[in-house]
Design a protein with these regions (language model features):
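Glycine-rich phosphate/diphosphate-binding loop of Rossmann-like nucleotide-binding domains
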Residues: 150-151, 155-267, 417, 448, ...
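Short acidic, glycine/serine/threonine-rich loops at helix termini
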Residues: 22-23, 46-57, 88-95, 140-146, ...
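Secondary-structure transition/capping motifs at alpha-helix termini
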Residues: 71, 123, 172-181, 203-217, ...
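Adenosine-phosphate binding glycine-rich loop
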Residues: 153-160, 173-176, 290, 294-422, ...
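N-terminal Rossmann-like NAD(P) cofactor-binding subdomain of oxidoreductases
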Residues: 138, 228-230, 268-273, 279, ...
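N-terminal ligand-binding/catalytic initiation module
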Residues: 1-152, 409, 420, 426, ...
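Rossmann-fold NAD(P) dinucleotide-binding segment
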Residues: 252-261, 270-291
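Flexible, glycine/charged-enriched surface loops at secondary-structure junctions
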Residues: 127-132, 179-183, 208-217, 379-389, ...
Length: 465
């Protein structure tokens, strides 16, 4: 195995002190770090527990910070927290570079994360953005709750996923002509993503006039055991209990769809093919324009394909997926399925947090980002192609607009520490953007008179007369 260059900073459970972590962070050659993406490698999307091999996730996310939001590369730092791995295949691999031990959990793990957060802010400043990525659900929610009011931090798997899903729903309601608060939503999957989306849907419904209780009544969660009902509320977390329904126990999605007659069906279960033709047909039977989001990644784990979604609803569905699908041609019309990818959201959120030096990131930030994303979907995209997200080419401009909207909110909430407040936020943001394109140093084409050319090359001319 050849090691060519470092790609980020590794911090292990054996470095569990503020001073040691501070020392490790000080080894990073750039001093003006403003954005960190950190993972412990436990729940790498579609791959599971990769331990120390999870470093590619922070590196990739920060590459998108640069490409999609124009954040300066020198401001970015990828970090991997190595507390071991429960992947026996890696532990048995003689070339595995991480700690060879089972994952550390409990107080020692919590202390390491506390020390990490303190060390980061001591080394780089209290406004340093810290994005948590691909932590297991058992850690993701507690860490977000513990740090979000004291640090500039967010969890993309929870909040970013929620924001992009709600953006798609808001855009879809422009075609259904019904507010989100007037719809019933069924979730297949009640993990980080499902709960995050449900919570943000509640916030949108509250802004549309419902109480929190009324909003939660419109949301139905299914986990691996079926619909979450009050009869089995004791078997789920407090977060799930808020959505428990006073209904008979139903173990299959088809039962729930037939009983509830939802307007929206969202899949975050990683169960391939869970949205069967019968379920899709039932959605079409109950809705003129059913909304179906199969958001699980990768493509092999999507709840249904785009082709099946359009086929079994006779083209009526407003469909989005977590993974890319090809365009679908049916009944003489071309459908362009939208991809509900977090990259519509987190680059713009990060850009705002970094440029306006946010002390923390309020929850409403992600609703603001969702609304801006939804508003960026053109009428042509909606009406001609039934696509509920902007095209990928528009993401960089979308990130700028999200950053401006969030910047206004940060100052309203008193959590932006950049002073004085820029009068023209758009101008301020655009002045800070990093360009990854090389400007040509010479003209690509020279005009030479044909008479001065011999076999395609210019003939030198003498200055002598």
């Amino acid at each position: 195995m050849s090691f060519f260059h470092f790609r980020g900073v590794y911090i292990t459970i054996d470095d569990n002190s503020i001073s040691k972590i501070y020392q490790i962070l000080s080894n990073w050659p750039r001093k003006n770090v403003k954005a960190i993406v950190v993972t412990d490698g436990e729940r790498i999307l579609g791959l599971g527990d990769l331990g120390a091999y999870g470093m590619g996730i922070p590196v990739g996310k920060l590459a998108l910070y640069v490409a999609l939001a124009g954040i300066q590369p020198e401001w970015c730092l990828p970090v991997l927290i190595d507390v071991g791995t429960n992947n026996q295949k890696l532990l048995d691999d003689p070339f595995y570079t991480g700690l060879r031990r089972q994952r550390v959990r409990g107080p020692e793990y919590d202390q390491l994360l506390d020390n990490f957060m303190i060390a980061v802010t001591k080394r780089f400043g209290s406004e340093t953005l810290i994005q948590f990525e691909d932590f297991a659900s058992s850690n993701a929610f507690p860490l977000l709750d513990r740090y979000k009011n004291d640090y500039c931090t967010f969890n993309d798997d929870i909040q970013g996923t929620a924001s992009v899903a709600v953006a798609g729903l808001i855009a879809a309601t422009r075609l259904t002509k019904a507010k989100l608060s007037q719809t019933k939503i069924v979730f297949l999957g009640a993990g980080e993503a499902g709960l995050g989306i449900a919570d943000l849907c509640v916030e949108q419904m509250k802004d549309e006039g419902l109480t929190e209780e009324q909003a939660r009544e419109k949301i139905f969660l299914l986990n691996s055991k079926g619909l979450i009902t009050k009869d089995r509320a004791h078997t789920v977390t407090v977060r799930h209990q808020k959505y428990a329904k006073d209904l008979p126990q139903m173990t299959t999605l088809l039962e729930v769809v037939k009983a509830v007659k939802p307007n929206v069906l969202i899949g975050v279960s990683t169960v391939a093919g869970a949205f069967t033709p019968e379920i899709l047909g039932e959605m079409a039977k109950n809705n003129e324009r059913p909304i179906v989001f199969a958001l699980s990644n990768p493509t092999s784990k999507a709840e249904c394909t785009a082709e099946n979604a359009y086929r079994y609803t006779n083209g009526a569905v407003l469909f989005a997926s977590g993974s890319p699908f090809d365009d679908v041609e049916m009944n003489g019309k071309i459908y362009k399925p939208g991809q509900g990818n977090n990259s519509y959201i987190f680059p713009g959120v990060a850009l705002a947090a970094v440029l306006f030096k946010a002390k923390r990131i309020p929850d409403k930030t992600f609703l603001i980002a969702a609304r801006r994303c939804a508003a960026s979907v053109s009428e042509e995209s909606l009406n001609e192609y039934a696509r509920v997200y902007p095209s990928a080419e528009e993401i960089r401009e979308l990130s700028v607009n999200i950053a401006i909207d969030i910047g206004n909110h940060l100052y309203e909430e008193g959590v932006a520490t950049l002073h004085p407040e820029p009068e023209d936020k758009e101008l301020f943001v655009r002045e800070q953007l990093y360009s990854y394109e090389y400007e040509p140093t010479v003209n690509g084409l020279y005009d030479w008179p044909e008479t001065d050319c011999r076999v395609g090359f210019p003939i030198p001319k003498s200055n002598e007369h």
